[in-house]
Amino acid sequence: MTALLSVQQLAISTAQETLVESLSFELHAHQALTILGETGSGKSLLANAIIGNLPAGLRSQGKIALFGQYQHQRTQAEREALWGKQLAVLPQEPWHALNPIMRAGEQVAEVHRLVMGNHAASAALTNSAFQQVALHQDQSKYPHQLSGGMAQRVAYLCATQTQAPLLIADEPTKGLDASRRDQIIALLQAQLTRGALLTITHDIEVAEKLGGTIIVMRKGVIQEQGPAQQVLSHPQSDYTKALINADPRYWPTTPQSKTGEPLLTVDNIAMHRGEKCLFDSLSFTLSAGEILGISGDSGCGKSTLADLLLGLLKPSQGRIHRPQAIPVGKALKLYQDPPSALAKSVTLQTLLEDVCRQHTVERSHIPRLLERLALSPNLLSRKANQVSGGELQRFAILRALLTRPTLLVADEPTSRLDPITAASTLQLIIELTQEIGCALVLISHDKLALEKTCHRVLSL
């Protein structure tokens, strides 16, 4: 039987360095293959090479065959003709994949009309699809009105309505709570009834539930390859063992430091979005140096509460009292979607220079933070769209901490990171904020991780 996807000795490089070492694999109908590894290991570059959409400045060697024909034998128009109908992609950044000026329902309906040519049934099929992912009341929303998890599910619908025989899912469960994650996993498993599934993830549990074959990568090099159950039950490489052991269940509890004076008091607030009540009767106090966790399902209002604490929104009722005014630039937010929060037209070095100039920050702090966040200085010469999502996440952390904030709200700060990097990065955020007495609000759908690191956890 001809493989739907055949990769032969594929390597990816820049003019200066090799990013992905030579690797080979095949994927047949009704098979699942998961590429598992840390951020920056070349997983997404592999997907781009298969699609035929490598970023500028990168080149590939080796051969890639889709549906029995080598990609280099196809014209660009012939490659693009596969997109959507034969080869579907669920991208890592859902907000980038969605049209910002189209409502969510319209974008899914457009797939039925333009790609499938099914005008008459597009509305009914779209309604059914949104009900399938528990978003039937959100079709009229624009992408910016969706939470990260909701946007992820809409992007999934756009990618899968054509029922393409080959689906590439890049971090498909990133930012989702456990119940939504399991729902998406079940939908991805349904792909195997009509074709093949290539999944890119750093989530051990996702890899385990999808089964099939696993390739473990680190820094562009294959560490281990084999059946999922065998690799995860009896890992051979030290890296695979470390990846499995980095689950939050095994994290040590962070020692609780002393807190200072109250920074803000939340008094009986409520927040409504149209007819929907996100939360009500919410009261608590946040003190200087305190670590407060906020957990809850996707779309429950976690990010909205963060914006209320920062003064970016006003509550529908109640009030937030700030005994002492926080200076401009000292109440900051680490956004859930760093690629959307960072300018794409300039280098990361320029972004840091802007912060240093605007807030009179010592540039001498940059090398130390780069080292502590495990970021290469070479990254600073690149633009935001030229680095991995996880590296960009850590860069956003560096940029925020440069200003020594009084209040830092971190919205899903480790959602793009593999377990090893997530554990060390979260611990580093805590250490660095505690060193300067900064109040830290951690937003996450991973309640266990919050319970291991926070003074208190608020569940919405």
Regions flagged by a language model, labelled:
Residues 129-144, 369-385:
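Conserved ABC nucleotide-binding domain
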Residues 84, 162, 403:
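Conserved signature/switch motifs of ABC ATPase nucleotide-binding domains
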Residues 93, 100-114, 337, 344-360:
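Q-loop/switch helix immediately C-terminal to the Walker
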Residues 156, 184, 397:
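Hydrophobic anchor residue at the start of the ABC signature
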Residues 132-134, 230-265, 453-460:
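C-terminal boundary and immediately downstream tail of ABC-type ATPase nucleotide-binding domains
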Residues 51, 310:
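Helix-to-loop junction immediately C-terminal to a conserved catalytic motif
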